[in-house]
């Protein structure tokens, strides 16, 4: 299936000169969504990834993460922006192009030695995925892989990530 044909291009968003890859059209396509989820699971199986948890980054990692976790017989754990999780959290602050941001995970969600696959819809510069990996590594987790629907190759986000397989279905 040609998944690229199911992704809408939005020029000059969020600012001039940026071509935004909108996956909402893929999400709205039943066969495309099924194919995407099956292909993500297959990528993980072929890479022999056997996580204890799939960690989804806010917010589109929440769309793909639970189904991926279910199919890999793993738990699903969300990583959120500040103030969204109500129990005690671990936090990490990371640099953005213009400032900083923070990510949080419940303290009781993962533990030292847990094998983790991190999932999101898209990797561009890799900043959020790197911060998520740093947060989990600080806890003592073992990052065994990263899974993305879309990878923007020219931004070289995978080069910023720790040494673990980086799997993506669609590359631009």
Swiss-Prot record:
Pfam families: Pribosyltran
CDD domains recorded: PRTases_typeI (cd06223)
Pathway note: Purine metabolism; AMP biosynthesis via salvage pathway; AMP from adenine: step 1/1
GO terms, biological process: adenine salvage; AMP salvage; purine ribonucleoside salvage
Catalysis performed (reactions): AMP + diphosphate = 5-phospho-alpha-D-ribose 1-diphosphate + adenine
One GO CC term on file: cytoplasm
The protein's name: Adenine phosphoribosyltransferase
UniProt source species: Picosynechococcus sp. (strain ATCC 27264 / PCC 7002 / PR-6)
């Amino acid at each position: 299936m040609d998944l690229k044909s199911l992704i809408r291009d939005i020029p000059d968003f969020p600012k001039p000169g940026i071509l935004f890859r909108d996956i909402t059209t893929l999400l709205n396509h039943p066969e495309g969504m099924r194919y995407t989820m099956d292909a993500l699971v297959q990528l993980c199986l072929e890479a022999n990834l056997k996580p204890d948890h799939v960690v989804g980054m806010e917010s589109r990692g929440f769309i793909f993460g639970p189904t991926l976790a279910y199919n890999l017989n793993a738990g699903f754990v969300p990583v959120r922006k500040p103030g969204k999780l109500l129990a005690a959290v671990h936090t990490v602050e990371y640099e953005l192009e213009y400032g900083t941001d923070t990510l949080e995970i419940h303290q009781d969600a993962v533990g030292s030695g847990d094998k983790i696959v991190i999932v999101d819809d898209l990797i561009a510069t890799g900043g959020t995925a790197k911060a998520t990996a740093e947060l989990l590594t600080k806890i003592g987790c073992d990052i065994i892989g990263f899974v993305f629907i879309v990878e923007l190759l020219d931004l070289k986000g995978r080069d910023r990530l720790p040494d673990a397989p980086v799997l993506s279905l669609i590359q631009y």
